[in-house]
Regions:
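Terminal alpha-helical anchor/extension segments at protein ends
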Residues: 1-115
């Protein structure tokens, strides 16, 4: 009945979120490999880019410390950056947490130096 339909819709929506998260992480990885001045990662480096309004999309692991997450989201909102929460339910999401400290950003423009 209706309950099953709602449950199925939730599963589909969760799947769509994962697809979107995966696409964002793939985009980040491609930029990192091919045009690394368009991305940055790590808490301090991302903070610097947020401070000058250079962040287009902020990627945050859902496993980040909540206070840190709140601070970064607030800074992103002040500059109009998009914020995407990325779960560790798939390889690229786990990699965000493991390799980049759970914090990365796709920039609005190429930075002069990486970081």
């Amino acid at each position: 009945g209706l309950y099953e339909l709602v449950e199925k819709a939730e599963d589909v929506l969760e799947g769509l979120d994962l697809v979107r998260e995966k696409k964002l992480m793939v985009r980040f990885m491609k930029l990192l490999a091919n045009d690394d001045r368009m991305v940055t990662y790590g808490v301090e480096e991302v903070r610097k880019k947020l401070a000058i309004g250079a962040v287009d999309t902020l990627l945050l692991s859902t496993e980040l410390d909540k206070e840190l997450m709140h601070e970064l989201v607030e800074r992103a909102e002040e500059t109009g950056a998009n914020v995407e929460l990325v779960t560790t339910d798939f390889e690229e999401g786990a990699q965000l947490k493991r390799a980049f400290g759970g914090v990365a950003a796709i920039l609005r423009y190429r930075s002069k130096v990486h970081g």
